[in-house]
Amino acid sequence: MCANDILAQGAIPLFFLDYLAVGKNYPEQVEAIVEGVAEGCVQAGCAIVGGETAEMAGFYEDGEYDIAGFCVGAQEKELLLSTENTKAGQIVIGLPSSGVHSNGFSLVRKILKDNNIGLNEEFNGSTVGKTLLTPTKIYVKEVLKVLEEVKVAGIAHITGGGFHENLPRALKNGLGMKIDKSSYEVPEIFKYLQEKGKIDEEEMYHIFNMGVGMSLVVNKEDVDKALSLLENGFVLGEVVNESGIEII
């Protein structure tokens, strides 16, 4: 997630540091967590240059842990993305998410609690818990390829606040986007949460990524080239002269 935030500026992730706090240090638990962090860094093409593990008995319950981290990236000033390059008529390309990613879990927990849904309940060939905890997709390597060969006007990392709070970050003031929700299939986990939580569809797009983890804004003539460099990119919508995000 940190690496994706850096990528959204047009920058390259360089290194990552982590902090892990536990109630009791269980080596097998710590090893599994660190392996996950290392795999994320491989996907982001950045190094782990340090970190800290703190054993805090009495503060965290036995078996509980808290993990945080930050990533540092860099780019030449003239290559950083600027919203001033966005304009009406440009095309919005969507990149599929791997699931809920790292946002919206306060609501997810409430939905599970209110409906007495256990994490081990069967869901779509797996379990609810495993589906919800599918690791966040890291887009660094494929998007850097696009940045090298295509003039990208803006990038939005779809995190907390969904489409409505994140897509405008890729645009200059006064512009908006018209999003075609029929351009892709919303993953089943979001339909499940919407049904169980009795949440209005419009509200879902204000909270979750709804199956789109990142978007790129490019000129029409560059769409085919950009799509050829992406694993599963698709045309999500277009930039318009009216501010706000319209989902049709």
Model-derived segments and spans:
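Active-site cofactor/substrate anionic-group-binding motifs, chiefly glycine-
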Residues: 1-8
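Glycine-rich anion-binding loops of enzyme active sites
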Residues: 12-106, 238
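Glycine-/charge-enriched secondary-structure boundary and capping motifs
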Residues: 28-47, 60-65, 122-133, 137-248
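Short loop/turn motifs at secondary-structure junctions
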Residues: 10-12, 107, 151, 232
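Short, compositionally biased
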Residues: 105-116
